């Protein structure tokens, strides 16, 4: 469970203890959507990259290889070779973003698979059963992620439905955890705050789900096209109504600068595909900004990706070499840059935690937030 160690303004330094290990927070969760991080990075590499938590996706694993298959193979941690905590997303975001021909009812959602078009039904109970089969450390409640922008009345009705779905998720998880064949009988459940960019809906919904006494709480439905300042405004509105004794998770966020600002507003956990996705397109995160390795100026550059970085890649390889690998279409280019970016994000969190430990987080933010947002 969550323990608050120190606080500076709204920023929190803590630790989150689970059956699969203790997470030092604030922390970044490395995204392995289908059980692997894109870019040929395995669980074997993740310890060297200082990863604490891996995030896998319920929707994708349900479709392929199938959650029953993963259960037969010992659960997601045994299946992937990762022995630390794993969070599984509920599948809700993918149902509402990838799947076609959705039909939303009180029972749940019927949708067409983005792989083969077959019709699938998923509701709160189905999402919990799939995540129970996966045996993750943390399961996310099934919710509706409403498009942005959305009509106020639709967003209001969706919030109410998501809260009702959460009650069903909690009941089903209690039942599943009590089963003798549960992969992880200590599986935790996080609720998700929704409400688009409407402050009153966000606050009302957060108050309602806070009363359910869950293991943690997430802010969802942000970083989906709204201006960055809108996202910060919603976090500031919701944060005072989140239980102080529970861990807080901002879903799908974000850039290094977003993370600094999120921590400043009281967030403990983050996840984003950006470190691996940007790396696969030749973009390396550094303390000076995001470096585009496709640029010709790196053709003869013998410096590492980041001269202040201690990752395995920066200890051995040059910008010129990785630039060449991208131009030559070599897979190693993606692997090396993904490894660097994941290390950078995890090291950023280490620096954030140290700044909080030493009571200098605000000055740390002011020193780095502008540079981290640059493109170089």
Segments predicted by a language model, with ranges:
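Non-catalytic, usually N-terminal nucleic-acid engagement modules in DNA/RNA processing proteins
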Residues: 1-183, 296-299
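Conserved, mostly hydrophobic/aromatic
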Residues: 21, 54, 89, 131, ...
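Glycine- and acidic
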Residues: 148-151, 156, 216-222, 331-334
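Glycine-rich phosphate/ribose-binding loops and adjacent secondary-structure elements
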Residues: 160-163, 172, 176, 184, ...
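Surface-exposed helix-capping loop/turn segments at secondary-structure junctions
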Residues: 172-182, 246, 352-364
């Amino acid at each position: 469970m969550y323990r608050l160690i120190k606080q500076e303004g709204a920023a929190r330094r803590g630790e989150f203890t689970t059956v699969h290990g203790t997470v030092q927070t604030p922390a970044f969760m490395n995204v392995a959507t289908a059980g692997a991080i894109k870019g040929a990075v395995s669980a074997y590499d993740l310890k060297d990259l200082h990863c604490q938590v891996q995030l896998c996706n319920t929707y994708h694993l349900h479709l392929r290889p199938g959650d029953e298959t993963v259960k037969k193979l010992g659960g997601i941690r045994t299946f992937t070779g990762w022995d630390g905590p794993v969070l599984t997303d509920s599948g809700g975001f993918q149902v509402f973003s990838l799947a076609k021909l959705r039909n939303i009812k009180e029972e749940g959602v019927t949708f067409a698979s983005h792989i083969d078009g077959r019709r699938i039904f998923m509701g709160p109970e189905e999402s919990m059963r799939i995540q129970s089969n996966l045996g993750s450390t943390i399961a996310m409640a099934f919710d509706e992620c409403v498009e942005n922008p959305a009509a106020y009345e639709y967003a209001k009705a969706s919030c109410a439905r998501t809260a009702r779905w959460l009650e069903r998720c909690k009941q089903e998880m209690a039942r599943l955890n009590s089963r003798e064949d549960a992969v992880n009988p200590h599986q935790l459940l996080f609720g998700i705050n929704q409400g688009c960019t409407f402050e009153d809906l966000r606050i009302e919904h957060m108050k309602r789900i806070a009363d359910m006494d869950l293991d943690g709480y997430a802010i969802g439905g942000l970083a989906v096209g709204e201006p960055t300042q809108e996202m910060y405004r919603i976090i500031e509105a919701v944060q005072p109504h989140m239980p102080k004794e529970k861990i807080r998770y901002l879903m799908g966020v974000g850039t290094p600068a977003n993370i600094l600002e999120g921590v400043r507003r009281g967030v403990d956990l983050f996840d984003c595909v950006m470190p691996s996705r940007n790396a696969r397109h030749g973009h390396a995160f550094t303390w000076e900004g995001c470096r585009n390795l496709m640029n010709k100026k790196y053709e003869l550059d013998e410096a590492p990706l980041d001269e202040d970085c201690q990752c395995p890649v920066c200890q051995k390889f040059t910008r010129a070499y990785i630039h060449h690998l991208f131009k030559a279409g070599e897979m190693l280019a993606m692997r090396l840059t993904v490894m660097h970016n994941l290390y950078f994000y995890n090291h950023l969190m280490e620096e954030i935690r140290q700044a909080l430990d030493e009571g200098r987080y605000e000055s740390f933010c002011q020193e780095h937030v502008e540079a981290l947002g640059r493109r170089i």
